[in-house]
Amino acid sequence: MKKICYVLLSLVCVFLFSGCSAGEEASGKKEDVTLRIAWWGGQPRHDYTTKVIELYEKKNPHVHIEAEFANWDDYWKKLAPMSAAGQLPDVIQMDTAYLAQYGKKNQLEDLTPYTKDGTIDVSSIDENMLSGGKIDNKLYGFTLGVNVLSVIANEDLLKKAGVSINQENWTWEDYEKLAYDLQEKAGVYGSNGMHPPDIFFPYYLRTKGERFYKEDGTGLAYQDDQLFVDYFERQLRLVKAKTSPTPDESAQIKGMEDDFIVKGKSAITWNYSNQYLGFARLTDSPLSLYLPPEQMQEKALTLKPSMLFSIPKSSEHKKEAAKFINFFVNNEEANQLIKGERGVPVSDKVADAIKPKLNEEETNIVEYVETASKNISKADPPEPVGSAEVIKLLKDTSDQILYQKVSPEKAAKTFRKKANEILERNN
């Protein structure tokens, strides 16, 4: 009997100790994780993103984050070889221009499961805010913020020239006249030249009720080459009149610090609304946000994902990467640091929480997006595979026109032929 009791007691002890051991293991500290996070931007973005990372590490001591950042051009040059080697960072800042290129090549993780299991909380985010990161119903990029195309103007130079902008109903002809008046009366460029063309030519098409790419990405959508001719003839007139910079001058701009409006050489810069804050911080002159020409009738403006976060399939820490994205998007303390610089927050809860604490320039962005949002249309799908080649082709074509090496008429036909060949080959 004693022997049986001893055996039973031994078994009980084994279970008790094993239970304690399992409990200790379960309650022990989490496994240390190192995440690589990459983004592009200027120095102000680098500074506050670093602070957000430090805040995340403080709240999650088991996570160490290695930051990798560069300007726009260098960022994509670095990302390409990393992608080829299967060594992409765990979280990569993504642009819609490259989303299809990486997503359709099976290099990005579908984030839908992380939104469904609550790892990324979408309870205060409108579904339309996320659509810009979807391809074939897979969420390859999570939108960090939204912005709207805008005209950013130096109020001192407008006043000096004795001109104003009637944003509700000004036309392309009004814009051209304004540029001439600014050059003549204020002695500065009337515009930064609407550079780069892959952003502003598609907007021009939208004001005419047309689109740049077909829905399926297999070719150009607009059929009338006269639209191309009209757009670039205006650009050429402005350069000839010295009211817009030459391509050589535009090529010297490597960051916001170099922009003509910051240097006081231009009264107007065309850009996305989230860029306003950076410009406002870099110049002493008062800047204002205006709706671009002819946006009203065709509802030419759209809410565009300013940028997205993606997780590559090669990441070994996808769950932790998704947790960081959730923090970046939904944490109010983090967004007090971000302050909408990456676009107006997609979370209504976060947007409402930070708005009372925004300064004048930051408030201007939110109010501009709210104004523009009253008259917008559905955003275009993410740029198709091959769009990077098309973008380069359009830029090269634009340069040739502005250098007067080719006529807009001839360039329109050549561009159409080559662009369609690229898109047909890739889609």
Curated annotation (Swiss-Prot):
InterPro entries: Bact_solute-bd_prot1, SBP. It comes from the Bacteria. Pfam families: SBP_bac_1 (PF01547). Induction: Up-regulated by growth on type I rhamnogalacturonan. May play a role in the degradation of type I rhamnogalacturonan derived from plant cell walls. Belongs to the bacterial solute-binding protein 1 family. This is Putative ABC transporter substrate-binding protein YesO. It comes from Bacillus subtilis (strain 168). The lineage of its organism: Bacteria, Bacillati, Bacillota, Bacilli, Bacillales.
